[in-house]
Curated annotation (Swiss-Prot):
Domain N-acetylmuramoyl-L-alanine amidase: 40-165
SUPFAM superfamilies: N-acetylmuramoyl-L-alanine amidase-like (SSF55846)
Enzyme Commission number, as recorded: 3.5.1.28
First and last residue of the signal peptide: 1-17
Subcellular location: Secreted
Gene Ontology CC annotations of this record: extracellular region
Name assigned to this protein: Peptidoglycan-recognition protein SB2
Molecular function in Gene Ontology: N-acetylmuramoyl-L-alanine amidase activity; peptidoglycan binding; zinc ion binding
Amino acid sequence: MKLQLALVLCGLTLALGQIVPRSSWCPVPISPRIPRLMVPVRLIIIHHTVTAPCFNPHQCQLVLRQIRADHMRRKFRDIGYNFLIGGDGRIYEGLGFGIRGEHAPRYNSQSIGIAFIGNFQTGLPPSQMLQAARTLIQIAVQRRQVSPNYSLVGHCQTKATACPGRHLLNELKKWPRWQPKP
């Protein structure tokens, strides 16, 4: 109980649906050279990582490091996503709020990118992942990082790609702020 209270007081709670700080999986701070976003943004772009899924903090942190390393090899400045959703129902901070991602060319300067860890071309994400994404969006609106009148789209709506997977895209189409075009 004391440890849990200490974590909550420090803002590091690991309860389901809460944001796990970047520092828990990546010791490297975000470069000050990465541009800031003009907030609130009006667009949320949903992705899937097409990696192995993860179902506990240790697995998810390993996958996050692999994704960041892959993005860096591809000459990104850092991990490309603002946030990632683990199969454990946790929200993992990538670049976080207010930092310009590298997840959807032509839209990076006006959006945040949320990636579901795994491949959702063949199946739907677990319900805890979907709920975590909804929670993150609520947090983003409450913190005035995302406009209350935001549009929600899948990555495939910004370029020719299968991302975020057909099952996840079909689910997103049921969400209230989903739009057919960015």
